């Protein structure tokens, strides 16, 4: 097994940089740079030197003996001054040593997974935590990283293994002292797991939206003030504004944190009949993105004139509050009048939806759980035929168990791992 190393902190100038090593030569390498009397596990303040004895930097050296480390291997970390030159000097020194190589993206975490220090959902949770931009995303990622989904899946798996064992007992030991009617307990176990799976499957879409972000489309006729409103919400000139109708022809996206939730605001082309080919393409795109959005804000005097059917959660506000005597339910992107109230309304709708989110956060999770649920449905149907078909019921249970094992990364995930770890930095 190679010993790997990489910069664990962000590239660039910083107060502190952390360089991580993992593998059989991690401790030996730490001693080469920091002195021979390092503890096998602990913290030391040392002067780091290269192979010629030249001083590299003063820093903190952390050592972790296997298996009590992040990767499950011997691990060492150098906490040094974060200048580009200092970091490069230490990395260059490590690269010149035999038996060491630069880590691939996510390789430290991959070793943690392979050594049983993390489950696949925890790896996904770590990736999401690194990418988290809002409080809701942080909390969601922390729950998965702390093992919430893995614990659920292991609990379901244990119940299904118990159910399968009961059926196998009837099949293999029918002539001995084994209860002949195990179906009540089996059905009870299936019902418990089935209810949990249905609940989690129902919450995946919203949970995934929290992970990736909600889309909120601003819709209205030309010159209603959509781009001005977008700029007001973004706090910058994200969209070009003009008195000329039809200025916006593409969909302009602005990412923002709205009450702790990740939201992408979409400024769309004004909806109207037009003979301009390019504007017409923009309007068609606007309609498609509006249909796909999680929430739509209609900024218009007359929604019916938009040719779009209102959905229950759609919001309708009147434009240009600064130019009308009655400002009820009206906003102005110029003065900001009514904008805070609109933001609160958007936030309330999305927070209400978010309350139904489950722990599972990805389409992969949903597919695995749906596969298990379908197998449980087939199991229940087969059980109706009595003990003669218990062998088929047991096989369906094994299908469900395998689906749950794929959920936590026990089987069939090699291609998926390559995709996940490609998104990690070298030091993770």
Curated annotation (Swiss-Prot):
<keyword id="KW-0378">Hydrolase</keyword>
<dbReference type="GO" id="GO:0005525">
    <property type="term" value="F:GTP binding"/>
</dbReference>
<dbReference type="InterPro" id="IPR031168">
    <property type="entry name" value="G_TrmE"/>
</dbReference>
<comment type="function">
    <text>Exhibits a very high intrinsic GTPase hydrolysis rate. Involved in the addition of a carboxymethylaminomethyl (cmnm) group at the wobble position (U34) of certain tRNAs, forming tRNA-cmnm(5)s(2)U34.</text>
</comment>
<feature type="binding site">
    <location>
        <position position="117"/>
    </location>
    <ligand>
        <name>(6S)-5-formyl-5,6,7,8-tetrahydrofolate</name>
    </ligand>
</feature>
<feature type="binding site">
    <location>
        <begin position="223"/>
        <end position="228"/>
    </location>
    <ligand>
        <name>GTP</name>
    </ligand>
</feature>
<feature type="binding site">
    <location>
        <position position="428"/>
    </location>
    <ligand>
        <name>(6S)-5-formyl-5,6,7,8-tetrahydrofolate</name>
    </ligand>
</feature>
<feature type="domain" description="TrmE-type G">
    <location>
        <begin position="213"/>
        <end position="351"/>
    </location>
</feature>
<dbReference type="GO" id="GO:0003924">
    <property type="term" value="F:GTPase activity"/>
</dbReference>
<keyword id="KW-0819">tRNA processing</keyword>
<keyword id="KW-0460">Magnesium</keyword>
<dbReference type="GO" id="GO:0002098">
    <property type="term" value="P:tRNA wobble uridine modification"/>
</dbReference>
<keyword id="KW-0963">Cytoplasm</keyword>
<keyword id="KW-0479">Metal-binding</keyword>
<dbReference type="InterPro" id="IPR006073">
    <property type="entry name" value="GTP-bd"/>
</dbReference>
<dbReference type="GO" id="GO:0030488">
    <property type="term" value="P:tRNA methylation"/>
</dbReference>
<dbReference type="InterPro" id="IPR027368">
    <property type="entry name" value="MnmE_dom2"/>
</dbReference>
<feature type="binding site">
    <location>
        <position position="244"/>
    </location>
    <ligand>
        <name>K(+)</name>
    </ligand>
</feature>
<dbReference type="GO" id="GO:0005737">
    <property type="term" value="C:cytoplasm"/>
</dbReference>
<feature type="binding site">
    <location>
        <begin position="267"/>
        <end position="270"/>
    </location>
    <ligand>
        <name>GTP</name>
    </ligand>
</feature>
<keyword id="KW-0630">Potassium</keyword>
<dbReference type="InterPro" id="IPR025867">
    <property type="entry name" value="MnmE_helical"/>
</dbReference>
<feature type="binding site">
    <location>
        <begin position="242"/>
        <end position="248"/>
    </location>
    <ligand>
        <name>GTP</name>
    </ligand>
</feature>
<dbReference type="InterPro" id="IPR027266">
    <property type="entry name" value="TrmE/GcvT_dom1"/>
</dbReference>
<dbReference type="InterPro" id="IPR018948">
    <property type="entry name" value="GTP-bd_TrmE_N"/>
</dbReference>
<dbReference type="Pfam" id="PF12631">
    <property type="entry name" value="MnmE_helical"/>
</dbReference>
<protein>
    <recommendedName>
        <fullName>tRNA modification GTPase MnmE</fullName>
        <ecNumber>3.6.-.-</ecNumber>
    </recommendedName>
</protein>
<keyword id="KW-0342">GTP-binding</keyword>
<dbReference type="InterPro" id="IPR027417">
    <property type="entry name" value="P-loop_NTPase"/>
</dbReference>
<comment type="similarity">
    <text>Belongs to the TRAFAC class TrmE-Era-EngA-EngB-Septin-like GTPase superfamily. TrmE GTPase family.</text>
</comment>
<feature type="binding site">
    <location>
        <position position="20"/>
    </location>
    <ligand>
        <name>(6S)-5-formyl-5,6,7,8-tetrahydrofolate</name>
    </ligand>
</feature>
<dbReference type="InterPro" id="IPR005225">
    <property type="entry name" value="Small_GTP-bd"/>
</dbReference>
<dbReference type="Pfam" id="PF10396">
    <property type="entry name" value="TrmE_N"/>
</dbReference>
<dbReference type="InterPro" id="IPR004520">
    <property type="entry name" value="GTPase_MnmE"/>
</dbReference>
<feature type="binding site">
    <location>
        <position position="223"/>
    </location>
    <ligand>
        <name>K(+)</name>
    </ligand>
</feature>
<dbReference type="GO" id="GO:0046872">
    <property type="term" value="F:metal ion binding"/>
</dbReference>
<feature type="binding site">
    <location>
        <position position="242"/>
    </location>
    <ligand>
        <name>K(+)</name>
    </ligand>
</feature>
<keyword id="KW-0547">Nucleotide-binding</keyword>
<feature type="binding site">
    <location>
        <position position="248"/>
    </location>
    <ligand>
        <name>Mg(2+)</name>
    </ligand>
</feature>
<feature type="binding site">
    <location>
        <position position="247"/>
    </location>
    <ligand>
        <name>K(+)</name>
    </ligand>
</feature>
<dbReference type="Pfam" id="PF01926">
    <property type="entry name" value="MMR_HSR1"/>
</dbReference>
<comment type="subunit">
    <text>Homodimer. Heterotetramer of two MnmE and two MnmG subunits.</text>
</comment>
